[in-house]
Amino acid sequence: MKYFIIRSLINKSKNFYNTIIKYNKTKLFALELSIISPQEIQNSAEYKREDGSIVGKVEDSTFYDLEKVNNKNLFSQQIFGPLIDFTCACGKKLNRKNKEINVCTKCGIEFLPSSIRSKRKGYIKLNYAMLHPFYIDYCEKLLMKSKKSLHLLLNMDSFFYFPSYKNWVNFLSEKNHIYLFLLKKILIYNRYSYIYKYSTFFKNRSKFPNNKKMNKLFFYNALGFYGLNSRKTWTVLDFIKGYNFFLGNFSKYYKKLSWYAYQQKISLNKYKSNNISINNFIDNTFNFYKNEVNSLCFKVGGDGIEMFFLQDMAVYSIINKFLKLRVLKLNNLINVNNKYYGKINTIIQNSKNYQYYFKHFYLKKIAPVWMTLRRIPVLPPNLRPILDLSGKNYQKTASSGTLLFMRDIMHEGNLFISDINTFYREIIIHNKKAFNFFSSLPTLYYLNELNIEYVNSKLWLLKYYLMPIQKSITSLFDKNPETINNFSNKKFTDLILDNVKPTSILDSLKGKYGKIRFNLLGKRVDYSGRSVIISAPHLKIYECGIPYEMALTLYYPFLSEYFYKKNNNILKKNYNKSELVLYSKSLIFTKSLQSILLSHPIIINRAPTLHRLGIQSFLPKLTHSKAIELHPLVCPAFNADFDGDQMAIHVPITEIAKLEAIQLMASSLFVYAPASGLPLLIPTQDIILGFNFYTNDLLLKTSREDKSIKQAMNQGFINECHIPYWIKINTKDIFFKFLAYPLRNYIIPIELQLNIKGFSKIIRLNTFKVTNLVFDSLDLLIKKNYISNWLILNNTKFKYLLISFLQNKNLLTNKQVYLRTTLGNIYFNKYLNL
């Protein structure tokens, strides 16, 4: 039958095989995840409508009054689309005659289907940069700051500071990132000839020349930071004074001059050839600072990290420092004491990790500044819904003339609002508050000798206005308690209801019930079912038992076509599926299903599908159980057993799919594993145990009472093979045979029960040892260990001694001796004639 079915399908579909080959040769494109720039976030969320207006920016934090004109809130119909198909907030519908008018002139809503609200996104523009919580660990590497220092910075307890130039834009316009690849040629142009002579990396200034200016210059130049000195807190702002300020920041400008000279292939030796001393060079540079530098610009939180990354040379200064040390070590130009040699080796070894990050940033053309957020994408409204539990319409929760905020609505207990909406609202509110406050203080971020006291009096406001934005962004993307607690010890009492942690975007994606696994990877498809598997050894290897009710549901379209071709009125084209159950017990359905299943293979899959053997095809057989029946030999390929495992059934629809299922995926084809070549269709576990259990010789061939047991079994009075039964046995034959042939493949009976002089005596036996003998006359033999092990029965003297003892007690002919065994043991020994 199987051969006939395969040949008939192949003959009907001769040209399908070529189609399969062409399909397998199609190219597959990979999915790459990368950091997106703020401008790309804005471009993907903005939409240009037919009237020329651009929408997408969310500015209002309210959830109500969706019919308001020019509304830009989180559920705006102008941004995300109408609530009702092709209907605006005014109640107007799309004019089929005049299709050129697609936007309502009154409320500004496009005439689109409501499903667009599941696709359109928006964005929130932040006035101040914030660090993305996913990239905190990466920023530690790029900034060479400890985790504690970085969290102090994000918690607004420390800050960055930068020299503020009058011509700041022109000063930072050089393309300094090319120096990363030219640094290997540094010795050719003799670039750092005045700096490499000394140990400029350590704080021990005794090794430097006596010139104090040169000592400070080399020390600050060796810090490796451009525009950043770590751990500067609010209490040390008074250090900004005249010449000391210049010495503290000159090294950073000196690097700029050095890199610029290197790009132009100019050596610093030109100053020596022109009789210009290094001291005069420093004084001239200080005059430049005095004229060009007007104040110190400091930044906190994400603004400071953004400004650090925005500088051209800042991103590569750290790796340049490591490359410089490696070049010096290779050329034996570092003359330091032994106590510093190990430290330099450690730093050079760790530099490989930093180069790894910089390499990927450069190759993927990703700017490190994108790790800070300037635009926040807003999900489509249907993915973050508001559910009305009272049955009212949430669009009209605002009464006449009054505006209800989200907190007031939530206290009513009528609405269920997604936590993501709460975080969006908090971000918009605090972003507006911070912008309105700091716009009135334009000089707050610039320090000089005149406004230090003024800035000190306003610094606490930075933390008050900017910290809530960072907390809300962290909670929006990731609710990890460690990440949240690092920013502030204050709990989210205003965001957490009933002590339940809010759900972030990451939480909605990950896990078993996340968007990816629940809606994409584990998506239910049509013509599929799922049930528990049970063992069915009576089936063929290529057969599978499918429940009758499941087959009626899966093959309903094929049944409809089958009866339609035969002009049968039982099923019509638009027949209701629920009425099919009424006819499910009819014989005509059973015969029709059986004829359909002959030419329709099914595909069975067991999750997780780790290799191609996890999905195979079978020929279905109807069963009246509610479980899928499988042959035990095919389970090793699926890595399945019968302890509650479930499998899914898929019905191939097209002829190509049927042909592929039979030719490429049939279970009878997977006799050997494709990876190792080892056999797959082998008996394992319960099959081997069953063979061993049912094929042991129980010495019941001489029993006179086994005929009645077999007769009762054949007549149906006994049908349980594993329930213990007590049967009478011929003790003389059994004991004699057992004692005569102790080393054969016999097993000792489970239990022997004898009735001697009205007292019940029990002998419990094991395969190797006598565990308990209650014959008083044999105590002496037990103490002498004559019968502790059955191998001792090879001693003929002991065998005759035991037999003579039993004969004297008339036990070998006693009919009141019973054997405790099972029906399966009796039947299989008789059936196999062992």
UniProtKB/Swiss-Prot annotation:
Gene Ontology biological-process entries: DNA-templated transcription
Pfam families recorded: RNA_pol_Rpb1_1 (PF04997), RNA_pol_Rpb1_2 (PF00623)
InterPro entries membership: DNA-dir_RpoC_beta_prime, RNA_pol_asu, RNA_pol_N, RNA_pol_Rpb1_1, RNA_pol_Rpb1_3_sf
Catalysed reaction equations from the record: RNA(n) + a ribonucleoside 5'-triphosphate = RNA(n+1) + diphosphate
SMART domains cross-referenced by the UniProt entry: RPOLA_N
GO terms assigned for molecular function: DNA binding; DNA-directed RNA polymerase activity; metal ion binding
Enzyme kind, highest EC tier: transferase
Function: DNA-dependent RNA polymerase catalyzes the transcription of DNA into RNA using the four ribonucleoside triphosphates as substrates.
Protein name per Swiss-Prot or TrEMBL: DNA-directed RNA polymerase subunit beta'
Gene symbol of the encoding locus: rpoC1
